Amino acid sequence: MSKHHGLGRRTFLQNAGMTALLGAVGGGAPSVAAAAAAGAAAQGMGGKYDFDTPYNRFGTMSVKYDQQIRVFGKDAVQVGMGIADIDFRAAPSITRALKARLEHENWGYIDGVAMQEDVFQKVSSWNKRRYGVTIEPSQFIVTAGVHPGLIATLRAFSPKGTKVLLQTPTYNGFYGDLTASWTEKEDVLLKRNADGTFAMDFDAFEKQISVDTNSFILCNPQNPTGNCWSQADLLRIGEICLKHRVVVLADEIHCDFVAKGQKYTPFASLPNKAIVDNSITFKAASKSFGLAAHKLAWFFSTNKDYLDRIKVQHRADLNTLGYIANMGAYSPEGEEWLNQLVEYIDGNTSFAADFVNSKLPGVKTHKPQGTYLMWLDFTEYAERIGTAKMAADYNRTKPAGQPALTKEQMLERHLVKNARVHLNAGHSYGSGSDHHMRMNVGTSRRTLELALNNLASALNKTSSM
């Protein structure tokens, strides 16, 4: 095999994928080269950034696109609407910072102390200015990602075999963190309101706490339901955790994406010192600026004893380019880029909610208060096409050694086959996720319209059969 095989394959995917996408989003779509040129002018007239031009991610080992092609087959997926990262060209301030550092062609060890000081200055200023949270240097630790930070914290507070509280449906990655920390899940269902939104069930939460419960992973804004938890919600849940000596691990990675008229309340901002001291907050630039592959995050706490316990379990081997990318992100230009993106995403969630509820038969959703993720209830449609029977039939006849599939995975396959759109199957988000799919709208409006129109065509065709 040629040593250039991988590069050739990626080049093919880039050209084929982008040509297909641009050809589908509207008449007169530019060629690949023209699209790249258009994308280069990221900030145009009036200081506005261009989020409308689809940006090619095919052939870059993207989980959202290339992994789905690997799983479902070449040409199977036209639009990836699953994994939680954004499709936009990076903020120019990030790209410039990375290009400048690449000009210095040496990649030796980085001074971790100096790097942490730089990251702290940017992050603490950002959190104080935008969210009113003051972070002291002694309260702040840089890590290689929210997952490594959570795993170290779980190992510090939850002995092997003990339980960790999760309010479900919740981010599926938490279950991997529990596996890595040798702990067990304790799902607590969120209440479902009449309009399809969700609320905390405080009585059920407290009843689930036992002598083996040491930690609770809070997701705020909540992935995948889109809740921005109120101060009252957080105070009540914080009181329960403090009463039962359950440590709060607050994952607030989606906090920069909040819909108009909604509010994100940091757990660290609560007006009760004892509750705040019983918590650790985890954040990163990865969701806000599309930096997941750069592997840099941080956590902080007002409780020195908690941090000392975590440090014993934690080691962060960080990389130079992750640091540089974050410096470019947390700049005045980066902040303006993000402000415009948040407004753009808010328009996407409004558009998508209206479209789903009016044009996708048998599917319901609601506009999220935060995140760029939407939680789609396919119950009526899934029961109509018989996904439970599909799963039972498949599992009865599947090849030996192959894993069993859930009804949500059968729906995932059905949508790929009939709409060429990939959504995340709901079964992995914990209890209360039956017949649900997660959709990411962190993409160009044209790409979003393509995905939704594909879904509408497929679902209406199936419904009329």
Where are these predicted regions, by residue range?
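N-terminal secretory signal peptides and thylakoid transit peptides that target proteins
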Residues: 1-21
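N-terminal small-domain helix-loop-helix segment of the aminotransferase-like
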Residues: 44-145, 152, 330-332, 462-465
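Conserved PLP-anchoring active-site segment centered on the Schiff-base-forming lysine
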Residues: 156-178
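Helix C-cap/helix->beta junction micro-motif
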Residues: 181, 243-244, 419
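PLP-dependent aminotransferase class I/II
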Residues: 278-358, 363-370
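Conserved glycine-rich beta-strand-loop-beta hairpin in the small C-terminal domain of fold type I
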Residues: 344-353, 365-381, 387-396, 433
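PLP-dependent enzyme catalytic core of the Aspartate aminotransferase-like
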Residues: 391-398, 402-465
